[in-house]
Amino acid sequence: MKRDEFDHVLRAAAHALGQRDFLVIGTAALLGSYPEESLPERATRSREADLAPFDDPDGDKSMLLEGALDLGSQFEKTFTYYADGVDFRSGVAPYGWRNRLVKYRSPASEPGVGWCLEPYDLAATKICVGRAKDFEFVGALLDAGVIGKSNLMARISLMPKDRITPAQIDRAIRWLDGRQPR
């Protein structure tokens, strides 16, 4: 996703739900910390922004967002990118992630504001979940020097052990230890 697309999605989400603040948990969260020009192509090729509306105890707002801006919506058909309304109550991130959120706001996103996962929290979450595309994404960030191995290892150690299994953490660490720098 490009910055102008991210701005548009935040603006559209804010108008669709009548609220301004959204947690950004997917790859688009990087746009809160870095200009797209400084990111590897793999980090900006997604067409979606994963947005979790704040103050959504029952997940109803996430469902409304899904209908208005998700894959297959008129919004996506018109613009080719979209917002995936997510409910982060079941999500997982390293301890302390809420204190490290990166606020993203621009004149083009108004009235929408994105509270983006910090890049190391995002990367740790992705490689502990461990899908092939997540390893590819994190590998691209490491190869481009956007994130560093030692800081990522430290963040992996903060993953909640009651939500991520020891096997998932071990797999992430083995993958990170076995990577050959490019």
Mark where each language-model region is:
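Compositionally biased terminal segments of proteins
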Residues: 1-182
